[in-house]
């Protein structure tokens, strides 16, 4: 389709991420910026095995100079996976066993918030939520 946006898959290694403090890490790549902030949560964002880990009450901000209409996070380990919400647009239906979290809308910036409890994770005990992702595809 002529004029259609081309999907860009962002992958990374842990050393590509930078941080202004332990409570905030960011990645700038291919015209996009991802910022993960601890906010009121108990744990700082963490990178392990090139997977980003955002914990309960953290935010994941995706931004660009150009509008985008779709974001898909490829999930890592879903042990304590929680509900993910967005400040604009719509997050796709989430369920236990998911391998991705999707968003649709029209924006230059979206802020995702990590839920408090492990609503959809494989851990049956009620624990603090996590959002672990290993790549992001944006268009």
Predicted regions and their residues:
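Short proline/glycine-enriched turn/loop motifs at strand-loop junctions of beta-rich domains
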Residues: 65-68, 75-81, 107
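Short, surface-exposed beta-strand/strand-loop-strand elements in extracellular ectodomains
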Residues: 74-99
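Extracellular beta-strand elements of beta-rich domains used
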Residues: 71, 134-136
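Short beta-strand-plus-loop segments that form exposed binding edges in beta-rich domains
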Residues: 112-131
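Short, surface-exposed tryptophan/glycine-enriched loops
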Residues: 99-109
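Short beta-strands within extracellular/lumenal beta-sheet-rich domains
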Residues: 43-67, 97-101, 132-133
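Extended, solvent-exposed, non-transmembrane regions
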Residues: 23, 28-53
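Extracellular carbohydrate-recognition regions
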Residues: 1-31
């Amino acid at each position: 389709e002529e004029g259609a946006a081309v999907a860009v898959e962002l992958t990374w290694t842990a050393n590509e991420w930078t941080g202004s403090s332990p409570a905030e890490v960011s990645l700038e790549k291919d015209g996009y910026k991802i910022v993960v902030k601890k906010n009121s949560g108990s744990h700082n964002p963490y990178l392990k095995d090139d997977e980003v880990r955002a914990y309960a009450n953290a935010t994941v901000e995706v931004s660009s100079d150009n509008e985008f209409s779709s974001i898909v996070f490829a999930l890592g380990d879903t042990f304590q996976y929680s509900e993910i919400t967005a400040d604009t647009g719509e997050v796709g239906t989430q369920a236990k066993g998911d391998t991705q979290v999707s968003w649709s809308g029209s924006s230059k910036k979206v802020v995702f918030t990590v839920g408090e409890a492990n609503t959809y994770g494989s851990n049956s005990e009620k624990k603090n939520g996590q959002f672990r992702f290993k790549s992001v595809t944006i268009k």
